[in-house]
Amino acid sequence: MFRMLNSSFEDDPFFSESILAHRENMRQMIRSFSEPFGRDLLSISDGRGRAHNRRGHNDGEDSLTHTDVSSFQTMDQMVSNMRNYMQKLERNFGQLSVDPNGHSFCSSSVMTYSKIGDEPPKVFQASTQTRRAPGGIKETRKAMRDSDSGLEKMAIGHHIHDRAHVIKKSKNKKTGDEEVNQEFINMNESDAHAFDEEWQSEVLKYKPGRHNLGNTRMRSVGHENPGSRELKRREKPQQSPAIEHGRRSNVLGDKLHIKGSSVKSNKK
């Protein structure tokens, strides 16, 4: 089941290395857990071959074996049905995102939890989100957390057609290492500021309520009453959230190692 759920993550370089390491840890854990019961599990999977050797046992034990085999078959059928459902869902999202003039949102996530004895639980989480808007506008968000290695990382990308600015942050809670890396696709680092402003400008066109706000302003031109003018004079200017966010980002950047890289894409 884990293979089915994270198949879409394995092809993404952001997740692939961590997923492969986590899968190997899971295999070792399952192998160590099944060793004391290995022969019993094999006998369940080979019930017909061992039936002649179990004639001395009572019917109750035979019925229990058949029940176990039936349970495994039912579980396999459930996994198969879920696999087909996930594949169909992924195809539908793929068809939806093809339309450049439509809005779409796609989200995928996977989580595993394991605990053996007195050891602390091991949790692995991975998620990805993609939002699209007309005009080739896209935002991608990816996040991953592995409690076993202590690694946490995230990436946010803003895209306009084949151009993109991606910021990646990672932190290892066990070693204390932190890093920020910027990736520039089909543009130079010097173009990043202008690109970010262009992306924000395009996104604001589709912000809910913007059209109504514009109509309200148009209707109010030349018809403003004295009460509203007095209210505007009393209003105190508030600091822009974007400015405050920028200050927090600068503080974070001072503490982390920031790297930038420009990438040229051959896609058309």
Curated annotation (Swiss-Prot):
Claim: Cytoplasm is one of the keywords in the record:
yes
**Per its UniProt record, what InterPro entries does this chain match?**
Myeloid_leukemia_factor (IPR019376)
Q: Which GO terms describe its molecular function?
A: DNA binding; protein domain specific binding
- Please tell me in which tissues this protein is expressed: Most abundant in testis, ovary, skeletal muscle, heart, kidney and colon. Low expression in spleen, thymus and peripheral blood leukocytes.
Would you identify the family this protein belongs to, as annotated? Belongs to the MLF family.
Record protein name field: Myeloid leukemia factor 1
- UniProt-annotated location(s): Cytoplasm; Nucleus; Cell projection, Cilium; Cytoplasm, Cytoskeleton, Cilium basal body
Organism field: Homo sapiens (Human)
Q: List the disulfide bonds.
A: none
Question: How is the subunit organization of this protein annotated in UniProt?
Answer: Interacts with CENPU. Also interacts with NRBP1/MADM, YWHAZ/14-3-3-zeta and HNRPUL2/MANP. NRBP1 recruits a serine kinase which phosphorylates both itself and MLF1. Phosphorylated MLF1 then binds to YWHAZ and is retained in the cytoplasm. Retained in the nucleus by binding to HNRPUL2. Binds to COPS3/CSN3 which is required for suppression of COP1 and activation of p53.
Tell me one Pfam family matched here. Mlf1IP
What are the site positions for Breakpoint for translocation to form NPM-MLF1? S16, E17
Q: Which UniProt keywords apply?
A: Cell cycle, Cell projection, Chromosomal rearrangement, Cytoplasm, Cytoskeleton, Developmental protein, Differentiation, DNA-binding, Nucleus, Phosphoprotein
Task: Region Interaction with COPS3: list its residue ranges.
Answer: 50-125
**Modifications made to the protein after synthesis:** Phosphorylation is required for binding to YWHAZ.
